[in-house]
């Protein structure tokens, strides 16, 4: 069989094991194939082994390691504007909620996004996605939530749909209209009813709804009513949960069968135990804790309880202006207690599971999409040690070499 591409001279081919989502102690189990080759045809991995099938193109990896293309399941692309001044405010002691209540935070980005054209959102988003691709991130979730009214929310969702067409990273959209209470509304219930009426229009762009369920934003009972409406319409559910305080949002995610509960920095033991016994994946975002100088989610406890854990960047203009996956993995290992094997599983197959893509992304296996990143390391175990200067040798997306260091 003649293939499109072969990758030879790989020191390690690293891939998660097990049926997704991979839970608890199984997250530390990786398939490590040493000194094997990969063959790709029609955008799919068709062979992994010692042979070198004839190919239209061959890459000599020169001892690099291969990981599945990384999957970032929680970002706030697309957005525009700059909130560097808020970073300085936080250094001077202002809290996230204090900045938000003063008209900064999410609402300042809302003003910028409402003014921006669709073209500007697409161009800004494409730039960020291209930079992420160079780091080996091949699939990214993006959210609305910086519009907070119908026209601007749909504009963000249109931008995500266009981004999925005009650049190489796969972009998976989520509706996060319930990100904050806009200035036009005084009553949260009234605003959530407004969003509920938008859902029929949103369905054209996404099958997933998210909400910022937090004390002072949308409380548990308010969130439950909105999410139940979305669920009744067939939407998959996600929650920003227990980020700033233990609010009950993580338990609500379990109750409603949400795909994920994200952040969980302030989740109590009872909440973590409930998540571990459910089908809800815990998403930890250590970059946000790092950026805000806050405590970190208890990733070690989540895994020890048996949860499926995913990692994500939370890339956004205010609380985490970071999209580097190797920094995120470093923080997961050094601050959240994960083993590097668990971090790899969390940023690949478990992340893909959240986006309903784990049947074709997040593993280097025959039949999976040929999304692969080659790193100039001796072993995957060097990722948290070398995180600030990892050489990305090549990125393969859908069987095409889309980035090469030379």
Swiss-Prot record:
EC top class named in words: hydrolase
Amino acids binding Zn(2+): 74, 76, 240, 314
Domain of life: Bacteria
Keyword Metal-binding assigned: yes
Binding-site residues for N-formimidoyl-L-glutamate, renumbered to this chain: 146, 316, 318
Keyword Signal: no
GO BP annotations, alphabetical order: L-histidine catabolic process to glutamate and formamide; L-histidine catabolic process to glutamate and formate
Chief subcellular location: cytoplasm
Pathway stated in the Swiss-Prot or TrEMBL entry: Amino-acid degradation; L-histidine degradation into L-glutamate; N-formimidoyl-L-glutamate from L-histidine: step 3/3
UniProt GO MF annotations: imidazolonepropionase activity; iron ion binding; zinc ion binding
Cofactor binding note: Binds 1 zinc or iron ion per subunit.
Reaction(s) catalysed (UniProt annotation): 4-imidazolone-5-propanoate + H2O = N-formimidoyl-L-glutamate
Compartments it resides in: Cytoplasm
Swiss-Prot/TrEMBL cofactor(s): Zn(2+); Fe(3+)
Keywords per UniProt: Cytoplasm, Histidine metabolism, Hydrolase, Iron, Metal-binding, Zinc
Residues noted as binding Fe(3+) in the record, renumbered to the chain: 74, 76, 240, 314
GO cellular component: cytoplasm
EC numbers, comma separated: 3.5.2.7
Entry binding sites for 4-imidazolone-5-propanoate: 83, 146, 179, 243, 319
NCBIfam families with a match to the protein in the record: hutI
Stated role: Catalyzes the hydrolytic cleavage of the carbon-nitrogen bond in imidazolone-5-propanoate to yield N-formimidoyl-L-glutamate. It is the third step in the universal histidine degradation pathway.
PANTHER family: IMIDAZOLONEPROPIONASE, IMIDAZOLONEPROPIONASE-RELATED
Similarity comment text for this entry: Belongs to the metallo-dependent hydrolases superfamily. HutI family.
UniProt name for this protein: Imidazolonepropionase
């Amino acid at each position: 069989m003649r293939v499109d591409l072969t990758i030879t001279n790989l020191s390690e081919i690293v891939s998660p094991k097990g049926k997704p989502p991979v839970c608890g102690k199984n997250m530390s189990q990786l398939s490590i194939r040493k000194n094997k080759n990969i063959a790709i045809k029609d955008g799919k991995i068709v062979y992994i082994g010692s042979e070198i099938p004839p190919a239209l193109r061959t890459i000599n990896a020169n001892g690099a390691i291969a990981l599945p293309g990384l999957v970032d399941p929680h970002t706030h692309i697309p957005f525009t504007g700059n909130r560097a001044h808020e970073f300085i405010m936080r250094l001077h002691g202002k809290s996230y909620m204090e900045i938000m209540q003063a008209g900064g935070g999410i609402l300042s980005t809302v003003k910028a996004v409402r003014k921006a054209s669709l073209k500007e959102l697409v161009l800004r988003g494409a730039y960020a996605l291209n930079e992420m691709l160079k780091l080996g991130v091949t699939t990214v979730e993006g959210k609305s939530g910086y519009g907070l009214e119908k026209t601007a929310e749909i504009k963000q969702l249109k931008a995500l749909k266009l981004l999925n067409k005009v650049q190489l990273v796969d972009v998976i959209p989520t509706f996060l209209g319930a990100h904050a209470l806009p200035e036009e509304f005084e009553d949260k219930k009234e605003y959530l009813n407004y969003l509920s009426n938008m859902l029929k229009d949103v369905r054209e762009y996404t099958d997933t709804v998210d909400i910022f369920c937090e004390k002072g934003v949308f409380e548990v009972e308010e969130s439950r009513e909105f999410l139940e409406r979305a669920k009744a319409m067939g939407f998959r559910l996600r929650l920003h949960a227990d980020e700033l305080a233990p609010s009950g949002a993580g338990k609500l995610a379990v109750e409603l069968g949400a795909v994920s509960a994200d952040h969980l920095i302030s989740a109590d033991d009872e909440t973590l135990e409930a998540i571990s016994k459910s089908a809800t994946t815990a998403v930890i975002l250590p970059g946000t804790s790092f950026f805000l100088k806050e405590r970190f989610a208890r990733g070690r406890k989540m895994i020890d309880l048996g949860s499926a854990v995913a990692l994500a960047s939370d890339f956004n203009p205010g609380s985490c202006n970071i999209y580097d996956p190797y920094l995120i993995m470093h923080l997961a290992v050094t601050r959240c207690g994960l083993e590097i094997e668990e971090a790899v599983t969390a940023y690949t197959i478990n992340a893909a599971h959240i986006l309903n893509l784990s049947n074709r992304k997040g593993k280097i296996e025959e039949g999976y999409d040929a999304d692969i990143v080659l790193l100039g390391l001796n072993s995957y175990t060097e990722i948290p040690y070398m995180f600030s200067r990892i050489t990305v040798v090549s990125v393969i997306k859908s069987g095409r070499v889309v980035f090469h260091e030379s």
